[in-house]
Swiss-Prot record:
InterPro entries (UniProt xref): MGP3_C, MgpC
Pfam families to which the protein is assigned, alphabetical: MGP3_C, MgpC
Domain of life: Bacteria
Stretches with biased composition (Basic and acidic residues): 265-286
Principal location class: membrane
Transmembrane segments: 1121-1141
Signal sequence bounds: 1-25
UniProt entry tagged with the keyword Transmembrane helix: yes
Entry keyword annotation includes Transferase: no
Compartments in which it is found: Cell membrane
Region (Disordered): 109-129, 213-245, 262-353, 411-440, 1192-1218
Protein name as catalogued: Mgp-operon protein 3
């Protein structure tokens, strides 16, 4: 079986990064089992890869299911283990004290039993053996040289489901049907045959379920469980459409349109082989083709007769689970041999030789001519279930020490032919670890063999399927998205899921929450009217009590097939199909009561927290339950309602008459066979029971002359979620309050769209009406109808979506608008495109930006259908610059026959679907047809195939080139380059030959003198300097002039429009070294100094030294002299221009100062004179009184002696001039 490869392409925006160093964002990561290996664009691994399970120190039973790269710094991975077991606490007492506990818990004891392979032996639940094997989100941080270091893990815990006491009826404590009741009823309805969580598969003509032979002791247990819940016993249909897995093993003959099984109790009604034909021919054919029917001969687990046993199916089931087949498709080479070197206990003979010292195990495998037909006609049910993510204990194997068995897988076998075991089916080339042994080629073809322990214990013990709640938990951890520290985990597109997780990257664990209701949008008024009239969706005077009851349930379906989720900017975008469908009447009689009517809608009330399961079982819900005692619930998720004389008109009061199945003599009276289908994976059986019915997930029947076709359309639920709503969902999930136990957060910006399935998935419809709906056509010839589906759901009319990828659409910018967000989803027959408004966090209005919020392009695949199988999607890449989405598919994983039961000639190779933002192009055989009904485009680029080599991986390099990794007959890896020519990828032999020359490096080395992948660089002679008068140029001048640099070399491209440039490096003042940078197929330029993740590429590009440049430019001296003179002139001018005016001002100032001084002197003299007069007058005044007094004195006095004369006083000097 081919290794499962998952590819991630990361674009490099060179303008944002230094040319010398290429970021790790330009590498690819290939997933090989649990190992993530970073690849360069040259298909070369950077290192040995990261084994995420071992790095996180988890049990080897864990497998990697999804991962996301967060820039260059973080890696987020999702892992899960098939050893997980979940138990449901069924409260039987009225004691309310326990109702606050979670009804769901991990069952470590059952996990230990599963690990030991024992159902009854003791289990050690202490210490390391008490693991619950829950799913985890692993976070790794980046380390140098493209490596990753484990940082932490986040446990995905179970949702909180409030326990309810017995006697609370169908209504929970909040007045609504609770999830507790839903899960309780799921467990009751599940169970009785191995692989079958639903007893409805094993039934007898017209006999009630409780009397069907389930095996020793199981009948009474069944009755007891149902009686406790007050459920009535329901009759089975009138024909056997089921099988018991301990007899028929549910094989489908791939070149026929019905499965081959052994009918129960010799009943011969129903499609397929009866007991006589089975025993006489088909049984032997199945045993020879598919060993799991019952091994015969040496090493066999027992003949088919030993599988009859009782209901416990001890030895037969054990042998089925223990087989280890080697699958090789039919070959024209009769002498091709593959054999195992030594005998093994069961199945093909094998032994693993384990070298000493922990070296890798080597296994030789050969094949005999008698084994060439193995698995060429039949497919095993358990293997198909395992492929879609269902836990099948016997197929869950992992590597480890002291392995007791092997599982061998061919690289060119289809994935549907071998057990899809964790340690086997996804194994690729050995990496040196004990978990991935090396290969030893012993014949024309080599196979990959993985050593690993099979279950311990006695072969008489039974490995039963885990309960349905365990399966729901396991399959709900299938894909993840990372948004700014919040991680969203959801289910798959193959099994309906009930819940999802939103956890923070800093949490240690996070609980799940479940889907809230969404409003139904039926598309057209007519379609809505159909549903209202037939199902009682509208409450009016004509509605009867049954319809009112159905209305009360709200037609809600919280079970989804997750088509995909992705992150764009700071928003999460998701899309899913509701697990149900609407059937239409195919009658051409316009007077018939069922003409143009939608006759059934599956509410999947068993999963409906608002409706409840009991109402369906007791036939109180009208259409979706037992009808007139002739129809019974077939499985947990979906129902089939074949109708004859269905309720008509708007009264809805006619008697329901059901004929089941429609037989040849009843064709004229039957009006419809309505397909109500919850899981689309039914390609391995299309009549009666499918392989997925074994899990209770699906029911489907063939469109042939004995059954009128129906039309089934679905509701596509989609939305955009911001960070705030994600946070609310995460916080709400942790709540244990009663209100939050039944109603979870509803994302406000979600919507549903009624998405029809294109009619051309059934061939031979009349072409009149130009693609009119099939049910609206006249003259339909029922006998010529044939499934034309190209995917793995070949015999289902149900829709299916995969590969959702979101991105920024810059197209509105050209019209003056902001860019919006776009997401593309591939569905059967076309492309769905969703457009979101980033400003409002909502879908675009129909008038916004000239874009519709949702568009669907009906684009048939035509004869190129062999290139497209939606179930084999490997990767999707969106390139905003070109507006293209690239979907890569692995054709090697397709079944041997397609939906038309015609053998496909070439199954080895890859296909790429290109979806563009505008227009519709369908490229087929180099012919292009342009359609215009929707703004999404579909182009099948076929041709990536190999007739001799095994293709193991594809790396889309651009919209023009893809690199394909292949292994030849000697198991030597090589790379081929495919070129897109008019929509078809064709191998380019010359380029493929060129990329081989890598000399053990990361990239192909450059080869002097030849035109290889890097083209050829011819340097000019040094004389070019004189010829072009460059000797007067300096090195810096040349480096900064691309035109001059380009004249130094001549480039011969290896492919059209390949570009090259020279980069100059100054080595001295007169010498220059030039090196080329050359464009590779991915559109990026690489040079000698380029690195990826810090690792030099060492391409060995040539270089050339040119000498003789001028040390100084010729203009340096004149400029220097001129600049000096100029400076002097400037200084002189400045001096003169400033000094002269300053002198004049000085002179004027001096003259002004003189005048001022004169005036001051005059004023000073005047003031001095006045001051002198004042002093004189003051002296005279002082002497006057004393003289007057002396004159008045009459008495004579003695004569006075005259005084001596005094010296004269100096004159008073005027003030000195300042």
């Amino acid at each position: 079986m081919k290794s499962k490869l998952k590819l991630k392409r990361y674009l490099l925006f060179l303008p944002l990064l230094p040319l010398g160093t290429l970021s790790l964002a330009n590498t690819y990561l290939l997933q090989d089992h649990n190992t993530l290996t970073p690849y360069t664009p040259f298909t070369t691994p950077l290192n040995g890869g990261l084994d995420v399970v071992r790095a996180a120190h988890l049990h080897p039973s864990y497998e990697l299911v999804d991962w996301k790269r967060v820039g260059d710094t973080k890696l987020v991975a999702l892992v899960r283990s098939a050893l997980v077991r979940v138990k449901f606490q069924d409260t039987t007492s009225s004691d309310q004290s326990n109702t606050n506990q979670n009804a769901l818990s991990f069952d470590t004891q059952e996990s230990q039993k599963a690990l030991n392979g024992s159902q009854s032996g003791s289990s050690d639940t202490s210490g390391s053996n008490s693991q619950d094997f829950a799913s985890y989100v692993l976070i790794f941080k980046a380390a140098p040289r493209a490596t990753w270091v484990f940082e932490r893990k986040i446990k995905l815990a179970l949702p909180y489901v409030k326990q309810e006491s017995q006697g609370s009826g169908d209504q929970g404590s909040n007045g609504k049907g609770s999830l507790y009741k839903t899960l309780q009823d799921l467990l009751v309805e599940q169970p009785v045959t191995p692989y079958t969580p639903n007893a409805g598969l094993a039934r007898v003509n017209g006999v009630a379920q409780d009397t069907v032979h389930f095996g020793s002791g199981q009948e009474s247990s069944w009755n007891s469980q149902r009686s406790q819940k007050g459920l009535k016993n329901n009759p089975g249909p009138k024909a056997v459409t089921g099988f018991k897995l301990d007899k028929g093993r549910a094989y489908r003959k791939l070149n026929e349109s019905w499965p081959v099984y052994e009918p129960l109790d010799s009943t011969k009604e129903g499609k397929g082989k009866d007991e006589s034909s089975w025993k006489n021919s088909e049984k032997t054919t199945a045993e020879n083709d598919a060993p799991l029917v019952g091994m015969v001969g040496s090493g066999a687990a027992g003949s088919a007769s030993s599988l009859q046993g009782n209901g416990s199916n001890s030895s037969g089931l054990k042998s089925l689970l223990r087989s280890a087949p080697v699958s090789v498709p039919p070959s024209s080479t009769s002498n091709q041999t593959l054999s195992l070197s030594n005998p093994a206990p069961v199945g093909p003979q094998a032994v693993v030789s384990q070298p000493a010292g922990g070296a890798t195990a080597a296994v030789s495998v050969n094949r005999t001519a008698s084994d060439t037909a193995t698995f060429s006609k039949y497919l095993n049910t358990a293997q198909a279930l395992h492929q879609m993510g269902v836990i099948v204990p016997g197929l869950e194997k992992w590597g480890g020490n002291n392995g007791t068995g092997v599982v061998a897988s061919r690289q060119d076998a289809t994935s549907t032919n071998l057990p899809h075991a964790a340690g086997a089916s996804q194994t690729g080339l050995g990496t040196g670890s004990p978990r991935e042994p090396a290969l030893t080629a012993t014949s024309q073809r080599a196979v990959t063999v993985v050593a690993g322990p099979l279950r311990a214990g006695n072969s008489s013990e039974t490995d039963a399927l885990p309960n349905v709640i365990t399966q729901l938990y396991h399959t709900s951890t299938a894909q993840l998205a990372y948004l700014n520290g919040q991680i969203v985990v959801m289910g798959s597109d193959r099994v309906p899921s009930l819940w999802y997780w939103v956890v923070g990257e800093d949490q240690e664990s996070g609980k799940a929450t479940w889907w809230a209701k969404t409003e139904l949008n039926w598309g057209t008024d007519k379609q809505k009217q159909f549903v209202e009239n037939q199902l009682g969706f509208k409450d009016d005077s004509n509605s009867d009590s049954k319809n009112s009851n159905l209305k009360a349930q709200g037609l809600t379906q919280p079970a989804y097939l997750i088509a995909g989720l992705d992150v764009v900017a700071d928003h999460l975008v998701f899309a899913a199909f509701k697990a149900g469908a609407v059937g239409y009447d195919m009658t051409t009689d316009s007077s018939a009561s069922t003409y143009n009517q939608a006759l059934a809608w599956s509410t999947t009330a068993g999963l409906d927290s608002d409706g409840g399961y009991k109402a369906l079982v007791e036939n109180t819900a009208g259409l979706n339950g037992p009808i007139n005692g002739l129809f019974t619930l077939l499985d947990t998720f979906a129902y089939v309602t074949p109708v004859s004389g269905m309720k008509g008109g708007s009264q809805n009061n006619e008697e329901v008459q059901t004929t089941y199945p429609v037989k040849s003599d009843q064709k004229a009276t039957a009006k419809i066979a309505s397909l109500i289908n919850a899981s689309p994976l039914n390609s391995y059986g299309d009549d009666g029971v499918t392989v997925f019915d074994a899990l209770g997930l699906n029911f489907n029947f063939k469109l042939n002359e004995e059954r009128l076709p129906s039309r089934t359309d679905q509701l596509l639920v989609y939305g955009i979620v911001n960070e705030s709503e994600l946070k609310s969902a995460r916080e709400n999930a942790q709540s244990t309050s009663d209100d939050n136990s039944n109603t979870k957060v509803k994302w406000t910006n979600t919507a549903s769209h009624y998405l029809p399935v294109p009619y051309y998935y059934s061939a031979n419809f009349p072409e009149a009406g130009n693609r009119r709906r099939a049910e609206q056509r006249n003259g339909v010839k029922i006998s010529t109808l044939e499934s034309q589906a190209t995917d793995g759901f070949a015999n289902s009319l149900l829709n299916f979506g995969t590969g959702l990828k979101a991105g920024v659409d810059p197209a509105p910018v050209a019209r003056g608008h902001k860019p919006n967000y776009s997401a593309v989803l591939l569905v059967r027959g076309g492309v769905v495109r969703l457009n979101f408004n980033p400003d409002t966090d909502k879908l675009l209005d129909s008038t916004d930006k000239n874009s519709e919020p949702i568009s669907f392009s009906y684009t048939p695949f035509g004869s190129a259908e062999s290139a497209v199988d939606l179930t084999t999607l490997k990767d999707v890449t969106y390139i905003a610059e070109s507006g293209l989405w690239f979907y890569t598919f692995d054709n090697g994983e397709k079944p041997t026959y397609d939906g038309k039961q015609q053998q496909v000639k070439n199954r080895k190779g890859y296909a790429v679907i290109t979806v563009s933002r505008t227009g519709i192009e369908f490229n087929e055989d180099a012919n292009t047809t342009t359609l215009s009904q929707a703004p999404a485009a579909l182009a099948v680029q076929n041709g990536i195939a190999s007739s001799q080599d095994d293709l193991t991986g594809i790396l889309p390099l651009s919209d023009e080139f893809s690199a394909v990794i292949t292994k030849d007959q000697t198991w030597t890896g090589k790379v081929d380059i495919y070129k897109n020519t008019n929509g078809l990828f064709e191998k380019d032999d010359q380029l493929s030959e060129n990329v081989k020359r890598r000399d053990n490096g990361l990239v192909p080395i450059y080869n002097e003198g030849i035109v290889d992948i890097w083209g050829r660089v011819d340097f000019a002679a040094n004389s070019v300097l004189q010829a072009r008068n460059l000797t007067d140029k300096t090195v810096d001048e040349v480096i900064n002039n691309p035109d001059i640099l380009q004249s130094f070399f001549k480039f011969t491209p290896a492919f059209d429009n390949q570009r090259a440039m020279l980069v100059g490096e100054k080595t001295s003042d007169t010498t220059l070294t030039v090196k080329p940078k050359i464009e590779y197929l991915d559109g990026n330029f690489y040079g000698e100094d380029s690195k990826i993740a810090g690792i030099p590429l060492n391409i060995d590009f040539p270089s050339r030294i040119f000498a003789g440049f001028a040390a100084l430019p010729s203009w340096v001296i004149p400029v220097s002299v001129g600049s000096s003179v100029g400076i002097l002139l400037i200084l002189l001018i400045l001096g003169l221009g400033i000094g002269i005016p300053m002198y004049k001002v000085r002179k004027l100032q001096d003259s002004s100062f003189v005048d001022v001084f004169k005036k001051v002197d005059t004023l000073t003299t005047a003031v001095g004179s006045v001051y002198k007069k004042i002093i004189t007058q003051t002296s005279v005044i002082k002497k006057a009184p004393s003289a007057l007094k002396a004159a008045n004195n009459a008495a004579p006095k003695a004569p006075v002696k005259p005084a001596a004369p005094t010296a004269p006083r100096p004159p008073v000097q005027p003030p000195k001039k300042a």
